[in-house]
Structure formats: structure tokens, C-alpha cells
Amino acid sequence: MGTKREAILKVLENLTPEELKKFKMKLGTVPLREGFERIPRGALGQLDIVDLTDKLVASYYEDYAAELVVAVLRDMRMLEEAARLQRAA
């Protein structure tokens, strides 16, 4: 079993370019736990999947980053991908 970071990376790698763009947009609207700050939208725009994964883990730590990715995927109605990440993480 891999790390949560690897699980996040694998799920994000399966998104189409349009889905990834939507994911980044929705990441800016998902409610955050107290004590965490949003990653500025401008900082997300040019990130590739590996850099986005690194930014998520650096900003929110692995556990919470995985929870956020699941929340965004659910908001996008990508329930299969969200469930896959939950099982892997």
C-alpha cells in the first residue's frame, strides 16, 4: 500500500485536462477546517499534477489533503474516483 500522497497523485493523474481545471477551481470553494488557509487560485493555475499534489500535501498535510481531494471530487460528482481515493488512502 502506498502513501496518501501517492493515492492523491494517482487519482489526479486520471482526470482529463478539463476535469483538472474544474478541480482546481472547485478547490477554492470547498470549506476548510479551522487553521487552514486556501491555496491562492493564481498559485494553482500553472501547476501540473505532480506539483499540485505536492502543493496540496505541503499546505494541508497528507491526511487532510486526501480528505479535501475526496470532497472536491464528490462536489464534481466524480463519486467513483472519490471512493477509490478513500479506499487507497
From Swiss-Prot:
Any one GO CC term of the record: IkappaB kinase complex
Biological processes, Gene Ontology terms: innate immune response; negative regulation of canonical NF-kappaB signal transduction; negative regulation of interleukin-1-mediated signaling pathway; negative regulation of tumor necrosis factor-mediated signaling pathway; positive regulation of interleukin-1 beta production
Tissue: Predominantly expressed in monocytes, macrophages and granulocytes.
Domain named Pyrin: residues: 1-89
Location, primary (coarse class): cytoplasm
Disulfide bonds: none
UniProt xrefs under InterPro entries: DAPIN (IPR004020), DEATH-like_dom_sf (IPR011029)
Matching Pfam families: PYRIN
Cytoplasm among keywords: yes
Localization (cell): Cytoplasm
Key words, A-Z: Cytoplasm, Phosphoprotein, Signal transduction inhibitor
UniProt keyword annotation of Metal-binding present: no
Record's comment on post-translational modification: Phosphorylated.
GO function term, MF aspect, one: protein serine/threonine kinase binding
Subunit structure: Interacts with PYCARD/ASC (via pyrin domain).
Function: Associates with PYCARD/ASC and modulates its ability to collaborate with MEFV/pyrin and NLRP3/cryopyrin in NF-kappa-B and pro-caspase-1 activation. Suppresses kinase activity of NF-kappa-B inhibitor kinase (IKK) complex, expression of NF-kappa-B inducible genes and inhibits NF-kappa-B activation by cytokines and LPS.
Annotated protein name in UniProt: Pyrin domain-containing protein 1
Species: Homo sapiens (Human)
Lineage of origin: Eukaryota, Metazoa, Chordata, Craniata, Vertebrata
